Every structure is written in structure tokens, then in C-alpha cells.
């Protein structure tokens, strides 16, 4: 119901003065103009701001969008952007990649925890408080220097650039504050910031973080990749990632073009939490079946196969064939022969599971942003899994799938968010369901 006490907005051409009401999705907040919902970028709840509406905005539109051009009454969570180029367009910004750059680090945690809780309530039909963890080192770094992968596009002058939000315009950049210092060192050494690229070409840097004495110095020297339009320009096509979980170090061979958790600490944090949840459900059972769905290059597969029961049998399923080849290589390197690693659509693969793997004790799934969807959730339930560990990169998809799993008789036993995307609205969530 509209708030009758809400002050009527003051409008000037395509701008309006509004009071921001609450958090919304995609790093935006909600306000109202003439009774219509407006999703506002670079705002915070309770602020009084001047907003410029995006064009076109028609009277018949269900909602409008806009961006802060002036802050009249700031929130205590507002800060000066640490990366001004990613801030509001009216304040010299406009490139994407850091839509919460105007929010303090504690404010970002609050924003994300509330967003996950609200989505779980609205779409998952369950009220739950969601604790959120910051990654080690992020507070000291001010939320910067965490990305081990970055992507850019060459502008008309061949310089690395990022697109200005909502346009095809390219803004040349000569650094990327969210990137790790290791990545920035590689970019400087390989003369990336000096340009010379074909206009319009896609530029990708993938640079695993060194892992101390474990990394061989000679091998580490070329453990990076500079790719242009998918082709290797410098470094190595196959990269080595090392992840230490509960004292055990795992080596992963990962294609430079493939997916890997982008935050330097995310594989350790997520891997440790997932393994601990699974072991808590198996309770040291010597014989168990585990499914690892949407398994990528095997981030969870390797520790699941080695750190659970002695006779654990596993099925891993991933749609990207290159990632599956990487996972199979990683498994062979550790002599893990009891994992059936398959490439293919998850739902179709689950229709034809071998009998000895058909009844999982625990299912671990890490689906893409769209989520697992109802069919896969129901297939998991039909297989008789007593525990489900769901890793989600989108709280909306998690909430929808939560409703399906609860409808199949599961109960949400544990949920925790991980801030592995500082300065952005993105958040990773891990949920445990049992029945």
C-alpha cells in the first residue's frame, strides 16, 4: 500500500527529489515517484537524493529506473567511492563492475545479508536470518585487490577499456582496483595498459594467486594467462590453482578461458565450508554415495573424494566439456578412481545414473546464476538424498529452488552467505537442506 505520508517528489525535467525506502535487487534501492516504483542506482535506504531517470521512461511503464545525481541527506553507510570511475555517472563514474562502491564495507555486508533474507522470505517462503562472512584480508585492503580474473574490451585506440553503463561507449582504463596485486603486476609486465590491441577485441587476464612455498618458483613464473579474443597472448593456457582445505592442499589444472571462483580466497572458504557440512551429514560413514552437480573443474570434487569416507563413490556432472576434462585430469593426478566425472546437461544425465551411484546420501550442487530449477531439485529428491548442500551465486534462484526443495519434504538446516564479491551486489550463499 502506498505510504500516504510520503512526501510528494519535487520534479525538474527528467530529475526528481526522492526519499529512498529500502534495498532492492541488482545493487539498487527503491523509491517512488507519483506512486510509481523507481529502482535507483547508487542510493542507500533513508537517503534524500536527486535522481535522474533513465530514458526512455514512459507513463505506461510498470516501473522506472534511474541514478543518483546528487545526495542531499546521506546515509551513515555512504562513503566516497574507492574507485571513482565505477561510481555514479554524474560524479565522474559510469563503468560497471562495482555497483556498491559508494557503500562502506559494513554497509555492504548488511545490504547483502538483508537481500538474501528478503529473497528467501519472498520466494522461498521461509523467514531466516542469514549470517555473512567477509573474506580474510578484504577489510585491510578496503574491499579492493581480490579479483584473480578480469575482462576488458579494446577501445577505438586499441587501449584496454570498460563500457560505460547503458551505452556502447568505451572508457580507457590504466588499472583495475579490484584486481589482485599479482594480476596488476602481470598486466604491467605484459604491457597490457599500453594498448596496441585490435579495436573491439576482448581482453582477459587470469592470474592465480601464489601459494607460498608450495608453488614451484619456475612454474609460477608463467602461471598466468593474457588472452585476446580467447587466444593465448602470453603465459599458459593451463593454469595451476592450489587450494588448502583443513590442512590438505589440492592442485587444480584449470583452463585459462574456463570458470574458476574469481575471489582469491573464495575456493578455500567455500571448499572448507562445504566439506565440513558434508562430513557433518555423513558422520564418518565408510561407505557413501555423493553427487557433485555443476561441478566445474572439480573444486569440490577433489576434497569430497578424499576427505569423506574411505569407500566414498561419487558422480560429478558438468555441462562444460573443457571443465570436465580438467576435472578428470585433476582426479587422475591424485589417483582418485572412484569418481564418475561426466560431461552433459545435469537433468538429462540424472535420468541415466548407473545403479551403484543412483541413491546418493548427499548431493552438492553449485548451479549457474539461473539456479538448478524445479526439475533438477525434484530429481534430487526422487533419488532419495537425505542431505543437499546448495551453493548459490544468486539469492533469487536459491530462494526459488528452496521453495521446491521444501515442497519435496526438505528442511533448511543451515544457511550462510560469503562476501566474495566486495564492492558489488553479488553474494555467494551456501544452504544445507535435510530430510
Curated annotation (Swiss-Prot):
<keyword id="KW-0808">Transferase</keyword>
<feature type="binding site">
    <location>
        <position position="318"/>
    </location>
    <ligand>
        <name>S-adenosyl-L-methionine</name>
    </ligand>
</feature>
<protein>
    <recommendedName>
        <fullName>Uncharacterized RNA methyltransferase BL1394</fullName>
        <ecNumber>2.1.1.-</ecNumber>
    </recommendedName>
</protein>
<dbReference type="InterPro" id="IPR002792">
    <property type="entry name" value="TRAM_dom"/>
</dbReference>
<dbReference type="Pfam" id="PF05958">
    <property type="entry name" value="tRNA_U5-meth_tr"/>
</dbReference>
<feature type="binding site">
    <location>
        <position position="261"/>
    </location>
    <ligand>
        <name>S-adenosyl-L-methionine</name>
    </ligand>
</feature>
<dbReference type="InterPro" id="IPR030390">
    <property type="entry name" value="MeTrfase_TrmA_AS"/>
</dbReference>
<dbReference type="InterPro" id="IPR010280">
    <property type="entry name" value="U5_MeTrfase_fam"/>
</dbReference>
<comment type="similarity">
    <text>Belongs to the class I-like SAM-binding methyltransferase superfamily. RNA M5U methyltransferase family.</text>
</comment>
<dbReference type="InterPro" id="IPR029063">
    <property type="entry name" value="SAM-dependent_MTases_sf"/>
</dbReference>
<feature type="binding site">
    <location>
        <position position="294"/>
    </location>
    <ligand>
        <name>S-adenosyl-L-methionine</name>
    </ligand>
</feature>
<keyword id="KW-0489">Methyltransferase</keyword>
<feature type="binding site">
    <location>
        <position position="366"/>
    </location>
    <ligand>
        <name>S-adenosyl-L-methionine</name>
    </ligand>
</feature>
<dbReference type="GO" id="GO:0070475">
    <property type="term" value="P:rRNA base methylation"/>
</dbReference>
<dbReference type="Pfam" id="PF01938">
    <property type="entry name" value="TRAM"/>
</dbReference>
<dbReference type="GO" id="GO:0070041">
    <property type="term" value="F:rRNA (uridine-C5-)-methyltransferase activity"/>
</dbReference>
<dbReference type="InterPro" id="IPR012340">
    <property type="entry name" value="NA-bd_OB-fold"/>
</dbReference>
<feature type="active site" description="Nucleophile">
    <location>
        <position position="393"/>
    </location>
</feature>
<keyword id="KW-0949">S-adenosyl-L-methionine</keyword>
Amino acid at each position: 500500500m502506498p505510504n500516504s505520508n510520503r512526501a510528494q517528489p519535487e520534479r525538474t525535467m527528467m530529475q526528481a527529489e526522492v526519499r529512498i525506502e529500502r534495498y532492492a535487487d541488482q545493487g539498487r534501492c527503491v523509491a517512488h515517484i507519483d506512486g510509481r516504483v523507481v529502482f535507483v542506482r547508487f542510493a542507500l535506504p533513508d537517503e534524500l537524493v536527486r535522481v535522474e531517470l533513465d530514458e526512455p521512461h514512459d507513463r505506461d511503464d510498470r516501473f522506472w529506473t534511474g541514478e543518483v545525481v546528487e545526495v542531499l541527506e546521506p546515509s551513515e553507510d555512504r562513503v566516497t567511492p574507492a574507485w571513482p570511475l565505477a561510481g555514479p555517472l554524474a560524479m565522474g563514474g559510469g563503468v560497471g563492475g562495482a555497483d556498491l562502491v559508494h557503500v562502506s564495507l559494513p554497509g555492504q555486508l548488511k545490504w547483502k545479508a538483508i537481500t538474501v533474507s528478503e529473497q528467501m522470505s519472498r520466494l522461498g517462503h521461509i523467514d531466516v536470518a542469514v549470517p555473512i562472512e567477509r573474506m580474510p584480508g578484504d577489510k585491510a585492503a578496503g574491499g579492493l585487490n581480490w579479483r584473480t580474473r578480469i575482462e576488458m574490451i579494446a577501445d577505438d585506440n586499441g587501449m584496454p577499456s570498460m563500457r560505460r553503463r547503458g551505452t556502447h561507449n568505451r572508457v580507457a582504463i590504466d588499472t583495475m582496483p579490484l584486481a589482485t596485486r599479482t594480476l596488476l603486476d602481470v598486466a604491467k609486465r605484459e604491457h597490457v595498459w599500453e594498448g596496441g590491441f585490435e579495436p573491439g577485441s576482448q581482453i582477459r587476464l587470469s592470474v592465480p594467486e601464489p601459494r607460498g612455498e608450495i608453488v614451484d618458483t619456475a612454474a609460477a613464473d608463467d602461471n598466468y594467462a593474457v588472452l585476446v579474443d580467447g587466444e593465448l597472448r602470453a603465459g599458459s593456457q593451463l593454469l595451476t590453482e592450489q587450494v588448502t582445505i583443513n590442512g590438505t592442499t589440492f592442485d587444480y589444472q584449470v583452463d585459462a578461458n574456463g570458470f574458476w571462483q574469481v575471489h582469491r580466497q573464495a575456493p578455500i572458504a567455500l571448499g572448507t565450508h562445504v566439506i565440513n557440512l558434508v562430513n557433518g551429514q555423513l558422520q564418518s560413514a565408510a561407505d557413501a554415495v555423493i553427487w557433485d552437480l555443476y561441478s566445474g573443474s572439480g573444486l569440490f570434487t577433489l576434497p569430497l573424494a578424499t576427505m569423506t569416507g574411505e569407500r566414498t563413490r561419487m558422480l560429478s556432472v558438468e555441462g562444460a566439456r573443457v571443465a570436465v576434462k580438467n576435472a578428470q585430469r585433476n582426479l587422475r593426478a591424485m589417483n582418485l578412481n572412484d569418481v564418475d566425472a561426466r560431461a552433459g546437461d545435469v537433468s538429462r544425465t540424472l535420468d541415466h545414473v548407473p545403479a551403484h551411484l543412483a541413491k546418493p546420501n548427499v548431493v552438492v550442487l553449485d548451479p549457474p546464476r539461473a539456479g538448478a530449477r524445479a526439475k533438477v531439485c525434484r530429481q534430487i529428491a526422487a533419488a532419495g538424498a537425505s542431505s543437499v548442500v546448495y551453493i548459490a551465486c544468486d539469492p533469487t534462484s536459491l530462494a526459488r529452488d528452496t521453495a521446491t526443495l521444501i515442497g519435496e519434504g526438505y528442511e533448511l538446516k543451515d544457511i550462510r552467505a560469503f562476501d566474495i564479491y566486495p564492492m558489488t551486489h553479488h553474494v555467494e550463499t551456501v544452504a544445507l537442506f535435510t530430510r
